[in-house]
Amino acid sequence: MTTTETPRKVDTGSVRTPAKKQPRSGRRGGLRSAVSATTLLWILAALYGIPVLWFVLSSFKPAGDLFSLPLTLLPHNPTLSGYKEAWDSANFSQYFINTAFVCVITTILTVGASCCTGYALAKYDNKWLKFFFLCILATTMLPSEVMLAPEFLVVRDLGLYNSFGGIILPAVLTATGCFMFRQFFLTVPDELVEAARIDGARELSIFLRIMVPISRPIMLTLAILSFQWRWNDYIWPLLMLNDPEKFTVQIGIQSLVGAQNINWSVLLGGSVISMIPLIAVFLVFQRYVMNADINAGLKD
């Protein structure tokens, strides 16, 4: 008895077709675009980095070598005399304490006020809030010098002249901070807020327990920017303060400039000293600036 084997049907759906090779021209085009983008980034980094590098290295040069020809990037006889003389000639320790106090208090108030304002502008539907937001944006179209005179008169009438409060109060609410928080809260789904309201949460609880934690990246970003703005602020503290014991770092650097001549080695040393806290703050907090998963509390 013989058996005949019937041929099996080939499942055409399970047969994998060999992947088509990408044309070399397409791969070359992608490589060229990547190389060109990388080259452009390196050029931009050099344009920004070389002046800063020259500035820092020049602070280690003696005063006589700064303008000697030919100009060189690296100091031939590196010295710390500029740093020492800058620290001794100006009361930098007191300036650092004053500036740090102003920056920390202003940053905390700026982040808190901007977060509350941005949440109200994003999640409450009111025509007056929209008009208020337009007024906030309109302030960005005015030069800062235009606002100096009215701000000075208001602060003087409040009795805050020659005080840290006079520096802190006008800098609390910023249009940039309100805009950043508003745009972030607009990306938060309204279902997240409605779900919390259905569960019986109050508005203050929704804001503090839900909105504030998920807005941490924006809070840290604004905190870094606000700290930088206040640390580098020069014009407003110069108008507000006349007591040398209350001067900030930037006014202290200006005091290093003589009436007849400028000791550039001392000025560069003081400027580099003033940069150290900003660099430290940025290096510490930059890793916390990341995107948050705002959809974690939503159900499909």
Residue locations for each model-derived region?
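Short, membrane-interfacial amphipathic segments enriched in basic
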Residues: 21-25, 71-73
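A detector for short, charged/polar N-terminal pre-domain segments
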Residues: 23-37
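Short, intrinsically disordered terminal tails adjacent to the first/last structured region
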Residues: 1-21
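Small/flexible residues
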Residues: 10-11, 18, 26-30, 63, ...
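A structural signal for multi-pass alpha-helical bundles of membrane permease subunits
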Residues: 33-300
